[in-house]
Design a protein with these regions (language model features):
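Histidine/acidic residue-rich metal-binding segments in metalloenzymes
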Residues: 1-45, 67-87, 120
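Active-site beta-loop-alpha junctions enriched in small/polar residues
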Residues: 8-10, 29, 49-52, 94-96
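Short Asp/Glu-rich motifs
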Residues: 14-16, 35, 56-58, 99-100, ...
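Short, glycine/charged-enriched secondary-structure capping and boundary segments
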Residues: 18-20, 38-39, 59-61, 102-105
């Protein structure tokens, strides 16, 4: 059975990766040690970037509060790409300002913007998505 963990911060991320989770959702506020653990693991990271990015200009939160969170997440995406961390797209659809359908489009576009290379972003996300599908596919024998 595959296991998915929803966590943020180094303690939660490191505990989840050490436990061998198959998929790590969110993973905000990671340091170098957390990223290194992910790089050495079989865990696929699903960052859900749009949950914060889509709040910019909305007025619900001050943009100056959101920008450092977004910048940190973007830097970790670039580091994860360079480190070969397995990453898959996921939008946290249904969260505030993350519409079903459009949320995943926004998420993929975020990766393209952050990496500055559409083909590289698509390949990286496709590889991670394939890994997620493999891990979470259940074969039922009747």
């Amino acid at each position: 059975m595959a296991v998915m963990a929803h966590t943020n911060g180094d303690y939660g991320v490191q505990a989840a990766v050490a436990a061998g989770v198959d998929s790590l959702e969110h993973g905000n506020y990671m340091n170098e040690e957390s990223l290194a653990m992910l790089a050495e693991s079989d865990t696929v990271w699903v960052p859900t970037l749009v949950t914060v990015r889509n709040l910019l200009g909305d007025g619900r939160y001050d943009d100056e509060t959101l920008k450092p969170i977004i910048e940190s997440a973007e830097e970790n995406i670039r580091k994860a790409f360079r480190m070969g961390i397995k990453v898959a797209p996921g939008s946290d659809a249904g969260a505030y300002r993350v519409l079903h359908g459009k949320g995943i489009q926004d998420e993929v576009q975020s990766f393209v913007e952050i990496l500055g290379d559409q083909d590289a972003a698509y390949r990286w996300l496709a590889e991670g998505e394939a890994e997620i599908k493999k891990k979470f596919t259940v074969t039922v024998h009747w």
